[in-house]
A protein has these predicted regions:
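Acidic/His- and Gly-rich active-site-bordering loop/insert found
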Residues: 1-113, 118, 122-126, 130-139
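General structural feature for long, well-ordered alpha-helical segments within catalytic domains
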Residues: 3, 14-21, 34, 38-45, ...
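Conserved hydrophobic/aromatic beta-strand scaffold that supports enzyme active sites
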Residues: 63-65, 202, 362
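Histidine/acidic-residue-rich, glycine-tolerant segments that coordinate divalent metal ions
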Residues: 86-88, 97-112, 118-119, 130-252, ...
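Divalent metal-coordination and catalytic microenvironments
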Residues: 25, 64, 79, 117, ...
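Metal-dependent amide/peptide-bond hydrolase catalytic core
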Residues: 223-425
């Protein structure tokens, strides 16, 4: 058994407080950009540790820097956790379920930790406690970075814009993790592309309005938008190789507000995902061709407005970091350390190591009760029977999930900072 595996199985650190913390975070979620209470809770927890705390960073971001031993001659490792919630109505029925209603874009919405960011925060604070108490096991610098506003893809860039690189030592390696559907406690990692890159595309079509009884006097943007939606479905199926991955989803389609008026404008908002730039460029050329072609075919007199926004970088795990950390995961978790499938979701985490010029590894943690997962797999009903991220009934199985998430965070950091790790060269 390696020294890391032995330490993490017998660390002797009391982490029983994690459950009450998790339930408090879960019951009191906050939307992206409004994480005042959560930030205060994190700061309160960090007060227990021997670390330098920097806050606020990029809004409500919090950074804790732990230095130990001959830290100037040993590596710097950063572990990140996000902590914002979602405008989702909770249906879990647990005593600590969120009942919060908060304003968003002019309307009141329910708020829930439907993506597990409460678990990410709890686990990273647990890793902080473990590494703070077991300073005999490591040397170097450990940075715990708590990031707000992941769900709107603004938090990482906000921290970067607020001088993140000048506030912390440059990490030799960065880590992050995410809970997902899967057997609770499983630690799933892979080299290379792990999460998709993404963009959103806002398309506005300006036609000509007319009374509903006189469609011949109009240039109907609703009809044009409908034709665009239909034609978009053929791009992935007919212009992208089956060996490649791409998604084009129409998430918003808006036009008019009266049943007897043909409107003057229609709006579509697309979400696109991919694993490489070659595919991205191909589908974007095709989208613009389809939009402009349908407008031309219908006699639209105005050039369509096509705007790209909410870009998410590809999460592309460094192969050397993976090769170093994965054997440690295998030894610490045994059969629960498995190879991850690529995840088609996207993250803003890569912006941080890219800005810091650091290699990184991002892995996932299974959060579904083991029995529920096994039954769903056996019945080929995972999509139907297993609650997934962003659903109102998504609730990680606490004990195995928090244990693996806390341990994985500490294991990855100790791979670089453990007392038997290599010095900087």
């Amino acid at each position: 058994m390696s020294h890391i595996s032995d330490l993490l199985r017998n660390h002797g650190v009391d982490l029983s407080w994690q459950e009450s913390l998790y339930q408090d975070l879960h019951e009191h979620p906050e939307l992206s950009g409004f994480e005042t209470e959560t930030s205060r809770t994190i700061l309160s927890q960090l007060n227990r540790f021997d670390c330098e705390v920097i806050s606020p960073v990029g809004g409500y971001g919090v950074i804790a820097i732990f230095r130990n031993g001959d830290h100037e001659n040993h590596p710097v490792a950063l572990m990140r956790a996000d902590f914002d919630g979602l405008p989702v109505k909770e249906t879990t029925g647990v005593p600590w379920a969120s009942t919060r209603i908060r304003p968003l874009d002019g309307t009141n919405v329910p708020v829930m930790h439907a993506c597990g960011h409460d678990m990410h925060t709890t686990a990273l604070l647990g890793a902080c406690a473990l590494l703070d108490e077991r300073r005999d096991a490591w040397q170097g610098t450990f940075i715990a970075l708590f990031q707000p506003s992941e769900e709107n893809a603004r938090g990482a860039n906000a921290m970067i814009a607020d001088g993140l690189a000048q506030k912390i030592p440059r990490p030799d390696v960065c880590f992050s993790q995410h809970v997902v559907p899967g057997p609770a406690g499983a630690v799933m990692s892979r080299p290379g592309a792990a999460l998709a890159a993404c963009d959103s595309i806002d398309i506005r079509i300006r036609g000509r309005s007319a009374h509903g009884s006189m469609p011949h006097n109009s240039i109907d943007p609703t009809y044009v938008a409908a034709m665009i939606v239909v034609r978009l479905q053929g791009i992935v199926g007919r212009e992208v190789s089956p060996e490649e991955f791409a998604v084009i989803s129409v998430g918003t389609l808006q036009s008019g507000n009266s049943n007897n008026t043909i409107p003057s404008e229609a709006r579509l908002v697309l979400n696109c995902r991919f694993y490489n730039d070659k595919v991205k460029k191909r589908i974007y050329r095709a989208i613009e061709r389809v939009v402009k072609g349908e407008c031309m075919a219908s006699g639209i007199e105005h050039e369509p407005v096509i705007e790209y926004f909410a870009h998410g970088e590809l999460t592309d795990n460094d192969v050397d970091v993976f090769a170093k950390v994965r054997p440690v995961f295998d030894e610490v978790f045994g059969p629960e350390s498995v190879t991850a499938d690529r995840w088609t979701a996207s993250e803003d985490f890569p912006n941080i190591p890219l800005a810091l010029n650091s290699p990184y590894l991002y892995w996932t943690i299974g959060a579904t009760p083991a029995g529920d997962w096994a039954r769903a797999v056996a019945a080929d009903r995972v999509a139907q029977d297993v609650p997934a991220n962003h659903m109102g009934d998504f609730l990680p199985d606490f004990e195995p999930t928090v244990k693996s998430a806390t341990t994985a965070a500490a294991a990855a950091v100790l791979t670089y900072l453990g007392v038997r790790s290599h010095r900087k060269v």
